[in-house]
Amino acid sequence: MSVQSSSGSLEGPPSWSRLSTSPTPGSAAAARSLLNHTPPSGRPREGAMDELHSLDPRRQELLEARFTGVATGSTGSTGSCSVGAKASTNNESSNHSFGSLGSLSDKESETPEKKQSESSRGRKRKAESQNESSQGKSIGGRGHKISDYFEYQGGNGSSPVRGIPPAIRSPQNSHSHSTPSSSVRPNSPSPTALAFGDHPVVQPKQLSFKITQTDLTMLKLAALESTKNQDLEKKEGRIDDLLRANCDLRRQIDDQQKLLEKYKERLNKCISMSKKLLIEKSTQEKLSSREKSMQDRLRLGHFTTVRHGASFTEQWTDGFAFQNLVKQQEWVNQQREDIERQRKLLGKRKPPTANNSQAPATNSEAKQRKTKAVNGAENDPFVRPNLPQLLTLAEYHEQEEIFKLRLGHLKKEEAEIQAELERLERVRNLHIRELKRINNEDNSQFKDHPTLNERYLLLHLLGRGGFSEVYKAFDLYEQRYAAVKIHQLNKSWRDEKKENYHKHACREYRIHKELDHPRIVKLYDYFSLDTDTFCTVLEYCEGNDLDFYLKQHKLMSEKEARSIVMQIVNALRYLNEIKPPIIHYDLKPGNILLVDGTACGEIKITDFGLSKIMDDDSYGVDGMDLTSQGAGTYWYLPPECFVVGKEPPKISNKVDVWSVGVIFFQCLYGRKPFGHNQSQQDILQENTILKATEVQFPVKPVVSSEAKAFIRRCLAYRKEDRFDVHQLANDPYLLPHMRRSNSSGNLHMSGLTATPTPPSSSIITY
């Protein structure tokens, strides 16, 4: 077992005479360092100064004399004062009383340096003992030891040198060992510091000891060292492998980064080329559309500005195509009048039949005789026109057949002219729409193909509303066409009105963004251009809306209309199955897009600006409050939306069911069921919808009774009697491959006739 300390070896008692009476340069230097040492703070401790001044003057004198003797001995002189003699006389007793704090250098393992120091110290101790024996009588006569005059905190009667830290006393402190019993109080002042108050005080360091016991042998240590070396080699090898792998990965990253930069550059070139080609194509389309519009201005007509008093209005003037059709129609009418006149003349030349041949002659003769009697003369001076020569019966029938054929031909020509006129009217509607679009596009600030949000390249204007413009755009990131709706606020609006409009648009964006259904137009993105302009990016559809189709074709077949209604109801069912449910509230033909532009294709619902969210807070048993009364399209809203009272009316998804019925009626008959030729203001003033208690069906075109019954269920006046969206989705009329065969309730499914169902069946019969 080995005990180590930082202060040196402490196996034996220290030799006080080595410090006090043996004049060595090391001891003198140690004394000077002790006297001149200052604590880390840089000034002597106040407690040591107070204790020094509180000493007896005699004790202070003895202490000074003792350390003066040490300094004198270190210079090598042989003379000493009486105080130094006294100190050397008490050398042995001081050494024995020092205890475990002495130096253990006498007990250390023999080394060349230590042997020399011990031999020199031994010779000095012998000389010192001779001096002590020669002066023993004078010192021993006093009867007191110098340690009796000191009270040191480390123990009564101990030598002042014992308070000196071992690191100062022992010159071999860095190579010595100590026992576990050696300890130094860190805060105990030393007598040296007390004796010299004007010098800095040494701050002793706190010592720590560690006792270690082991049974390791050299073989085990060698094995451990070998194992550690092997582990170290493995770790170094692993580190080298990882460094090489890291270098490889860094090289791969650099290669991939270069490749990525190359692809990015190539992608940017492709995007730039795509933009260039799209702009060229759009420019050519704009030029061709304007050329075609100029040609159609002469053929179909154009707008002219007409002054009425102090104001100017635009008036439509038909082109030569309509003028030619009008002339042809006038010629047909004139030909018809001529044929009718000739038919009347032919009737006068109709030959008499055999039974009636005498009667007309007798009558004529009687008239002639009467005329002569009145005139009084038989010779008439006036030339009378000859009576038309009567035709034979064959000639009469021949002429009559010719006139009938001519009338039939004129009727056919008139029908063709009417059909051509209707076709030209449809083309004229497109032409008028294109003229307005071109005019709006020329006045738009986005006409020069800008790229919005560094992503959407605007191509051409699709349409314009009250406060918004819709452009066909190309998404450069997703490489697809899109419809960008640009909302522009009026700069003269108050900030409150702008905030309300923006809040309304953000609400529409939040509602529409969460919807994902094949029958609903998708909303891709939303961003702002400035404080007064923001955009929404929607799915682009090639075709027109249902309203434009109805204006072009007036109506459609029942199969086509039923297909459109089925898709609308499917989308409404989705809106009512999500949480929270949504009421569209603005269903109309203008908000139903025909993907292919025909009635036999897919449809998509758009425009959720007036939608209502049926959350738990606002929706109750009777529905939710209508907070935006007066908004919407009046022809397609139910009667409960027009009720005025102290409290707002309650609405539910049955509002959309009413709209479906109106749209279905308009598709079948080409007109609206209520307020067809009225404006919204007239509908509101005359309470047209509030009076719409029952729907009336025209005689033509012919529509099935099942379709009429379906419309009645949708247009029930009381909302309690009206179907909701879920009931409407399960209506037998909309179920696929099912038709009503007769009024008894038979159903045909895929060509098979089903048996009549009892009244208690789940299938509703009408």
From Swiss-Prot:
Family per similarity comment: Belongs to the protein kinase superfamily. Ser/Thr protein kinase family.
Activity regulation (record text): Cell-cycle regulated, maximal activity in S-phase. Inactivated by phosphorylation at Ser-743, potentially by CHEK1.
Coiled coil: 229-280, 397-445
Keyword Membrane: no
Chain spans, region Disordered: 1-198, 344-381, 745-766
Protein name: Serine/threonine-protein kinase tousled-like 1
Pfam families named in the record: Pkinase (PF00069)
Lineage, broadest ranks: Eukaryota, Metazoa, Chordata, Craniata, Vertebrata
Tissue: Ubiquitously expressed in all tissues examined.
Gene Ontology annotations of biological process type: chromatin organization; DNA damage response; intracellular protein transport; intracellular signal transduction; protein phosphorylation; regulation of chromatin organization
